[in-house]
Amino acid sequence: MSATILDGKATKNTIFEELRPRVARLAEQGRTPGLATVLVGDDPASHSYVRAKHNDCAKVGINSIRKELPADASQSDVEAVVDELNADPACHGYIIQLPLPEQLDAGPLLERIAPEKDADGLHPISLGRLVLGEQAPLPCTPRGIIELLRRYDVPLAGARVAVVGRGITVGRPIGLLLTRRSENATVTLCHTGTKDLAEEVRRADIVVAAAGRPHLITADMVRPGAAVLDVGVTRTDSGLAGDVHPDVAEVAGFLSPNPGGIGPMTRAMLLSNVVEAAERAAS
């Protein structure tokens, strides 16, 4: 058996096509959505990530707002930019690109973002509202995972899901999303304290691997026909490696590879959050 590939790139392009008319309608009202990025320093990877986000904006018709500061920027310098974006009606959502230079404290800066402009969906208030079932921007990567599964008709209601990794970006929030009534999955959150990881994974209909450990999930751990999503990524001597061993493709029913799976979906959900924020502001 060879797994059906959950193609994040193709799905991202489809979502972009769906966003374009929504953006155009807002533009006709003089309310073109705007995504801002705050980039501090000269890290090549950060510049590449930010450039990709703004290229995505151009494809959909979203306005790009770029705020770039030197590597020696102070905490107050970045705070001033955050305050400016919070007050800018042309900005409907923004991100502070991480990592930041070592002299900066990321936590207070991220909390300073106006919750309604939290494009990543990871502001403490956004996560609190998610727990309460209230409207808020959703975390981009978990939202992208669920959207990808839905687009390929992978059943969620009643499914047993093993989430491997308990990070704030994916592991913890995806459990909140998957256990909403709209999804109705049963979630097991696995981590370094899990006694028998292989057994927990083997019971699952859906596996979300987000531990950041190369090839942690092997073929013998996966139930035949299960959906496996490789989210974690690690830089090794031979290049980037995901959490899922390539041999899993011969056992799984569905596989979201890394790269090409969840990364593009995260970018699509970032733009979706911004468009939805603009629509709320216009209503």
Curated annotation (Swiss-Prot):
Any GO BP annotation: tetrahydrofolate interconversion
Complex and partners: Homodimer.
GO cellular component assignments: cytosol
Organism of this sequence: Saccharopolyspora erythraea (strain ATCC 11635 / DSM 40517 / JCM 4748 / NBRC 13426 / NCIMB 8594 / NRRL 2338)
Record-listed E.C. numbers: 1.5.1.5, 3.5.4.9
Classification via InterPro entries: Aminoacid_DH-like_N_sf, NAD(P)-bd_dom_sf, THF_DH/CycHdrlase, THF_DH/CycHdrlase_cat_dom, THF_DH/CycHdrlase_NAD-bd_dom
CDD domains assigned: NAD_bind_m-THF_DH_Cyclohyd
Keywords: Amino-acid biosynthesis, Histidine biosynthesis, Hydrolase, Methionine biosynthesis, Multifunctional enzyme, NADP, One-carbon metabolism, Oxidoreductase, Purine biosynthesis
Keyword Oxidoreductase: yes
Catalytic activity as recorded in UniProt: (6R)-5,10-methylene-5,6,7,8-tetrahydrofolate + NADP(+) = (6R)-5,10-methenyltetrahydrofolate + NADPH; (6R)-5,10-methenyltetrahydrofolate + H2O = (6R)-10-formyltetrahydrofolate + H(+)
Residues in coiled coil: none
Alphabetized GO MF terms: methenyltetrahydrofolate cyclohydrolase activity; methylenetetrahydrofolate dehydrogenase (NADP+) activity
List of residues binding NADP(+): G165, R166, G167, T192, V233
Protein name: Bifunctional protein FolD 2
Pathway note: One-carbon metabolism; tetrahydrofolate interconversion
